[in-house]
Amino acid sequence: MMLTKSVVISRPAVRPVSTRRAVVVRASGQPAVDLNKKVQDAVKEAEDACAKGTSADCAVAWDTVEELSAAVSHKKDAVKADVTLTDPLEAFCKDAPDADECRVYED
């Protein structure tokens, strides 16, 4: 006779309760680098390059201006699309993070 071992589960496995607190990270919305200043500097450099240098140097300098201008435009679009910067509740929670409306719950 062959003996078989049967497994009896008396209670389902229970996940331990996590003691971690929920952390909410919000972007400040402030650029780390002032892109407008960089664009202005690049325009001055491009004008100087066109006045003094070859057409290739001039083209490269204006390409740099174009890239920086595009970065400024993309940054503005991202700020407009960022809910944390335009939502009044987010502004309220920044000033009063302990308010009931600002609590964050984990599942």
Swiss-Prot record:
Keywords: Calvin cycle, Chloroplast, Copper, Disulfide bond, Nickel, Plastid, Transit peptide. GO terms for cellular component: chloroplast; protein-containing complex; supramolecular complex. It holds the Pfam family CP12. Binds copper and nickel ions. Copper ions catalyze the oxidation of reduced thiol groups and thus promote formation of the disulfide bonds required for linker activity. The keyword Chloroplast applies. Its main location: plastid. Residues 1-27 form a transit peptide. The keyword Transferase does not apply. Contains two disulfide bonds; only the oxidized protein, with two disulfide bonds, is active in complex formation. It comes from Chlamydomonas reinhardtii (Chlamydomonas smithii). Disulfide bonds join 50-58, 93-102. This is Calvin cycle protein CP12, chloroplastic. It is found in: Plastid, Chloroplast. The gene is CP12.
